[in-house]
UniProtKB/Swiss-Prot annotation:
Keyword Nucleus: no
Gene name per UniProt: truD
Protein name in UniProt: tRNA pseudouridine synthase D
Known EC number: 5.4.99.27
Organism name: Campylobacter jejuni subsp. jejuni serotype O:2 (strain ATCC 700819 / NCTC 11168)
Catalytic residues of the enzyme: D85
GO terms assigned for molecular function: RNA binding; tRNA pseudouridine(13) synthase activity
Enzyme class: isomerase
Record keywords: Isomerase, tRNA processing
PANTHER family: TRNA PSEUDOURIDINE SYNTHASE D
Catalysis performed (reactions): uridine(13) in tRNA = pseudouridine(13) in tRNA
Organismal lineage: Bacteria, Pseudomonadati, Campylobacterota, Epsilonproteobacteria, Campylobacterales
Family the UniProt entry places it in: Belongs to the pseudouridine synthase TruD family.
CDD domains, A to Z: PseudoU_synth_EcTruD (cd02575)
């Protein structure tokens, strides 16, 4: 697999099979709203202030710069649980040293509001959130397309979704991962944060390609015979039978890495029949590889073979990255929707665990790339 010679953006496979649905989506502050959900309650005491903010059409870093200039707090002294996109309206939490509290009473900005202030013992860190709730408004939706949207949402609610990394990881032209590969090959870059971001884009690209291969396997297992699966994947008759027996869409594989969902340690899938029950109950999920020296290793069999197809040409860089695992299969929570036929608006609300992308879910529903 020669990544740097590819001229087209890789498009992961969808898990649902319907045709594209016509709807208009604009990622603006009225039609795309994100609400961060903290991992824990704030204590009400300590040396840090927690600011609950609403920002519109600003990145998290742009919001921090505005607050820094107004307060005198250095950007590095702010804390946040997650970086949020520029487009849309975002409600999120930031932390800052309490000694700068006095500036808050006079703070005013047209795109940035401070809604609430809490006190806490520690600075917010990346990952200190449970997840995010989303509101999405689609426009120009005909009644026939509204019915298709409802069916797609019911299917996703039942089966879950492929937890791909979103376009935000890969840049305007979808090729950030190529720059990450160049850095791993020795290209120098002074900006440490940008260097880390580009390397993570490389890891994310490989993760998406492997997950897409697993989605393909799941489709094939549903649609093809045991004999055809044996020919395609060079597996035993028993392994083909195991695949065909699995009723859920996303097929688990013996020897792959699983994790307790939505938070928990990794472990190998040794007893497939036992783990299938826990997977269907949404207690565990399959974990894809973010390549690196410390990532939990896959065991054996088809899971390892498929992984090697994607990662074999990049193993020389493994020691240069820490690595980890990421859930490949996620679930919509608190899902609801409503259709206003008169306005031709279709509104969707749901909650996602941290690290999942609402735009990935929306692309799966609509079956088209949002920002081409």
């Amino acid at each position: 697999m020669n990544l740097e010679e590819e001229n087209t953006i890789f498009k992961p496979l969808y898990s649902l099979k319907h045709s594209p649905i016509n709807a208009y989506f604009s990622k603006n502050s009225d039609d795309f709203v994100v609400r961060e959900r903290p991992l824990y309650e704030f204590s009400g005491k300590g040396e840090h202030l927690i600011l609950h903010i609403n920002k519109k059409d600003l990145t998290t870093n742009e919001a921090l710069k505005i607050l820094s200039e107004a307060s005198g707090v250095k950007i590095r002294d702010f804390g946040y649980a997650g970086l949020k996109d520029k487009q849309g309206s975002t409600f999120q939490y930031l932390s800052m040293p309490k000694k700068f509290e006095s500036f808050l009473s006079n703070f005013s900005h047209p795109k940035l509001k401070i809604l609430e202030i809490f006190t806490h013992e520690n600075k917010l860190r990346i990952g200190h959130l449970k997840g995010n709730s989303f509101f999405i408004r689609l426009k120009k939706v005909l009644p026939s397309d509204a019915l298709k949207l409802e069916q797609a949402l019911m299917n996703l609610d039942k089966q879950g979704f492929a937890n791909y990394f979103g376009y935000q990881r890969f840049g305007k032209f979808g090729d950030n991962y190529k720059e990450g590969l160049e850095i791993l090959r020795g290209k120098k870059m002074k900006n440490v944060k940008m260097k880390e971001f580009l390397i993570s884009a490389f890891q994310s690209e490989l993760f998406n390609r492997y997950l897409s291969k697993r989605v393909e396997l799941s489709h094939f297992a549903n649609d093809f015979s045991e004999k055809e699966l044996i020919q395609i994947y060079k597996i035993s008759k028993e392994e083909a039978k195991e695949l065909k027996k699995q009723e859920q869409f996303f097929k688990l594989l013996k020897g792959e890495v699983l994790g307790h969902y939505p938070f928990g340690k990794c472990f190998l899938c040794e007893d497939l029949s036992a783990e299938l029950g826990r997977f269907k109950a949404r207690d565990i999920s399959a974990m894809g590889l973010l390549i690196g020296a410390k990532a939990y290793e896959t065991g054996e069999g088809l899971a390892l073979n498929l992984e090697n197809e994607i990662f074999k040409d990049t193993l020389e860089f493994k020691a240069k990255m820490q690595g980890s695992r990421r859930f490949m299969w996620g679930y919509l929570e608190e899902l609801k929707w409503r259709y206003d036929e008169e306005k031709a608006h279709f509104c969707i609300e749901f909650f996602l665990q941290k690290g999942s992308y609402a735009t990935v879910v929306l692309e799966e529903i609509l079956h088209k790339n949002l920002f081409e």
